């Protein structure tokens, strides 16, 4: 039970950090700027893996949809938060990151048995079949 709680909490912490960094006027004061689109891509790859641990029984399309809608919401929030701006390219990079992150989860789940057991630990699917239906 503690494992499942920690899996969910790490995702909520990630959302809180991403929301803060996405809506703060000068995030470069908190995080060094490297390549903006690469950072978006990598960040949302991590988010896709994170949501997969928090909600492993959600179908893949629901995990992807949640993160893409969240990404669009952050971009809309930036439009109203100068000097931040709305960027369609950020959304594209975020979507690509989500796709890569979910592909990595699928590959790890299918090829490394302990990963799948860890992913579904203390879920209804783990107790019944040990496999994800979505």
Q: Which stretches of residues belong to each language-model region?
A:
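Bulky hydrophobic segments
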Residues: 1-91, 95, 99-134
């Amino acid at each position: 039970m503690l494992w499942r709680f920690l899996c969910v909490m790490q995702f909520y912490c990630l959302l809180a950090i991403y929301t803060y960094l996405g809506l703060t006027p000068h995030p470069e004061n908190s995080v060094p700027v490297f390549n903006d689109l690469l950072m978006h891509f990598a960040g949302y790859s991590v988010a896709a893996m994170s949501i997969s641990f928090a909600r492993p029984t959600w179908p893949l399309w629901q995990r992807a949809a949640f993160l893409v809608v969240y990404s669009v919401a952050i971009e809309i929030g930036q439009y109203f938060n100068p000097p931040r701006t709305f960027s369609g390219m950020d959304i594209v990079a975020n979507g690509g990151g989500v796709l890569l992150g979910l592909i990595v989860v699928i590959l790890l789940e299918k090829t490394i048995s302990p990963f799948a057991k860890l992913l579904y630990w203390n879920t209804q699917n783990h107790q019944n079949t040990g496999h994800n239906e979505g």
